[in-house]
């Protein structure tokens, strides 16, 4: 069964929705773990920058690869995926839950 990437929101689209509705919000990312082969990011999303607790969180794990975006940018890709997951875990999923970037990885396997 195939899938249509156009039915998934990009992280950029989710961010635009978030900032449009929460101009005083805050997004915080943390590199939780990194070694020579992989990294793990956590993102926290806050409705207001002064909120003591996040409204939603998201995690992402990426491995460095020999081809594709993760050959040169697995850390950046991981942070972006983590942010997209945190936004989707709240209300910014725009239909299907995974981001377009995450679903694009399916073709790699």
Predicted regions and their residues:
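Positively charged, aromatic-enriched nucleic acid-contacting surfaces
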Residues: 22-109
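Basic/polar, acidic-poor N-terminal "presequence/leader" segments
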Residues: 1-23
């Amino acid at each position: 069964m195939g899938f249509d990437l156009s039915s998934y929101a990009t992280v950029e689209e989710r961010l635009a929705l978030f900032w449009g509705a929460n101009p005083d919000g805050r997004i915080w990312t943390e590199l939780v773990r990194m070694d020579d082969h992989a990294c793990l990011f956590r993102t926290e999303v806050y409705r207001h920058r002064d909120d003591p607790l996040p409204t939603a969180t998201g995690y992402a794990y990426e491995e460095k690869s020999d081809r594709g975006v993760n050959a040169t940018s697995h850390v950046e890709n991981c942070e972006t995926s983590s942010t997209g997951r945190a936004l989707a875990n709240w209300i910014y999923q725009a239909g299907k839950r995974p981001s377009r970037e995450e679903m694009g990885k399916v073709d790699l396997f």
